[in-house]
Amino acid sequence: MKKTVRELLLVENTQLNHDNFRLVLQSAAELPPMVPGQFVNVEIRQATEIFLRRPFSIMDTDPAKRSFSLLVKILGRGSKVLTTYKPGERISTILPLGKGFTMPSASDRILLIGGGSGVAPMLFLARMCGLDPAQVCVLLGAKSRTDHIDSTGYQQFGNFHFTTEDASLGEKGFVTDHSVYKSKLSLFDKIYACGPGPMMKAVARDAHEAGLFCEVSLENTMACGFGVCLCCVEKTTSGNKCVCTEGPVFNINELTWRY
């Protein structure tokens, strides 16, 4: 898929909770096709000391408006500066980057699991897969109610569940502690997950033991986005691979994780 450098217009900057923001960017020309799980590298112009672009996951797209949204979590100086941008400002991007999720077949029952800011690609995936809402189960986890990211778009899916570590929203615990996960995992044909490493490894372990198809979106540190700097390399069954170009989505059978 061809990568392009685009100067985009910021049309919306919405704070979703204390450290997560949704930025909506619009292009003057038609955007290239984007796949759930891909990301965008953004230049932080207002901070001259920040040399490298920052990668952000695509939350959703609106081809009719030539726009898409990014989830920006404040993790450092670059992301913090980006959240101060105002609608009307222009942002330099490189897009789309990486390999996204494999689309399910029409008969598949799928489980989408997002932890923390890993919820970013899940709504996009749920919408793009084109399945009946009854075939889609969404399970989102966070530390507390205040850490959960806006879930309005998920309401169309009947099987939509929360977990929080302090029981302030949904069931208490991690996503792997949820009653649906523990009792109905084997009913799904495909599992897709994005979130903290320990969460994804736990999901991968359970999917492996159940013999289920499972893809995870890794969150390795990235710099260039083109597989040149090698800072995001992940060991796989077929050698080292750059997460920014050969991921960030991998089938769990490609990874060398030990359960």
Which stretches of residues belong to each language-model region?
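FNR/FR-type flavoprotein reductase catalytic core
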Residues: 77-219
